[in-house]
A protein has these predicted regions:
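Segments forming oxygen-rich coordination pockets for charged ligands
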Residues: 1-113
Length: 113
């Protein structure tokens, strides 16, 4: 299901017919703050509803979502993120955590299931 803040934000997007990106954790490895299935809605202005763990991972997810919303990236993506440093291998070694997110553009006039 969806957290209440995601439902509220998505209802606003639908009312305004504004697209958004839904990010869902589909796998995680090592030490991570959120569980598989956790969702976050990324709005066109870069703001979010919900959280997939914060920090650099959410920053990178917001960057990718922005590109998806402008059409410079495919509307569905499976992306890997690691905590910590810029280099993912160093980040995995330093913090011991990584995750995969499935990101999909939701059209503002559609229902989220």
């Amino acid at each position: 299901g969806f957290a209440p803040e995601i439902r509220v934000a998505w209802a606003q997007c639908r009312q305004e017919q504004t697209d958004a990106v839904l990010a869902t954790i589909v796998s995680r490895h090592g030490s991570m703050p959120r569980e598989v299935g956790t969702k976050m809605l990324i709005l066109p202005d870069g703001s979010t509803a919900g959280s997939v763990g914060g920090g650099i991972m959410e920053y990178r997810a917001r960057q990718l979502a922005g590109k998806m919303l402008t059409g410079t990236e495919a509307p569905q993506q499976l992306a890997s993120f690691a905590t910590g440093l810029e280099d993912d291998e160093k980040a995995l070694a330093a913090c011991g955590g990584s995750m995969e997110l499935f990101l999909q553009v939701l059209a503002g006039g559609t229902e989220a299931k």
